[in-house]
Design a protein with these regions (language model features):
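Two-component/phosphorelay signaling modules centered on CheY-like receiver
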Residues: 12-30
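C-terminal output helix
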Residues: 19, 107-120
Length: 123
């Protein structure tokens, strides 16, 4: 069975398109557009296996905060994928995290599926 993914993206068009793509590939997807929504969805869906998040969200919220909040609920080895166009300081925010994968924006759909197959097969 494929992982249940929490997808966090503040751009509604990107969120909808990515969710549709992942669902078409057979994944179960729960969406959130903010840190607060991500925490709410993580609490409401105990069967989540993985989070995919944009790095920069609305206001001062970041994907790093999303991952930290979900890991507080699910444990420090909860797997995460960050998708972002920011390749500067954001990259270094995750140095040494063996349970995280980083993809640049725009994320190639076939690359995302490859990462999901290889990074999260046993979630």
């Amino acid at each position: 069975m494929k992982p249940h993914i929490l997808l966090v993206e503040d751009n509604a068009t990107v969120l909808g398109a990515t969710a549709l793509f992942l669902e078409g590939a057979g994944y179960r997807v729960t969406t959130a557009a903010s840190l607060a929504e991500a925490i709410e969805r993580a609490r409401a869906n105990p069967d989540l296996n993985l989070v995919i998040t944009d790095y920069h969200l609305r206001g001062a919220d970041t994907g790093k905060q999303v991952i930290a909040a979900v890991r507080e609920l699910r444990g420090p080895t909860f797997r995460a994928i960050v998708i972002s166009g920011d390749t500067s300081s954001a990259v270094h925010a995750f140095d040494g995290d063996n349970y995280l994968c980083w993809l640049g924006k725009p994320a190639n759909s076939s690359l995302l599926l490859t990462v999901l197959r290889n990074f999260a097969p046993a979630c």
